[in-house]
Amino acid sequence: MRSFVGYEKGINFGGWFSQCEHTKKHYDEFIGESDFAAVSSWGIDHVRIPIDYDLIENGNGDIQESGMMYIQQCIDWCKKYRLNMILDLHKTCGFSFDEGESESGFFESEELQERFFRLWEEIAKRFGKYHDCVAFELLNEVTNKEYCDIWNEIADKCIFRIRTIAPETYILIGCLLYTSDAADEARSV
C-alpha cells in the first residue's frame, strides 16, 4: 500500500467547527493555537479539521468570510507548527450523517449538488495554493448504501471541478457506511 506521507499520525479536531454550537464564542475558545503547538510536540504530523457548511456559507449559499478566516487561521497555525491539515466538509446543505438530521435532499437535488460543487470551488480557490500541507476531504461519511452510485457521480464531478483550480491538492473520498469496511461498495474515483 502506498504511504500518504505527512498524513500518517493524526488527530481529529472535531466539535470545533462541526457538530457544535455555531457561535463566535465557541469558535474562538474551543480550540486555539496552543492546541496546535501541543499536538505537534507529541509527534503528530497532521490535524483533521471537520467543518459544517454553515461555518463558511449562509442559508442562501453566500460565502461567509468570517468562517473562511477561521480556516486560514488553522492553516497558518499548521504551517507554524509543521503540521499538515485535512479540511473535511462534515456536513453540506441537504446532507448530514448526524442522528436526527440525515439526508435531506442532497442526493436527489441537482441544485444542492451544484451548491456543493460551488462551495468546493471556492475552498479550492482560497486554499488550493497550500497543496503542500492541506488535503481536502469531500464529504464525511456517506452512510447509506443506496447512495453509492450517485455519490460516486457527485464525487467525480466535484474532483474534476476542484482539479481545474487546485490540480496538486490531495483529495480524500470516504467510503459508505461510516467509512467502514464497505470499500467493495464504492469505486475508486
Task: Give, region by region, the residue ranges found by the protein language model.
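Active-site mouth of glycoside hydrolases
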Residues: R2-Y170, C175
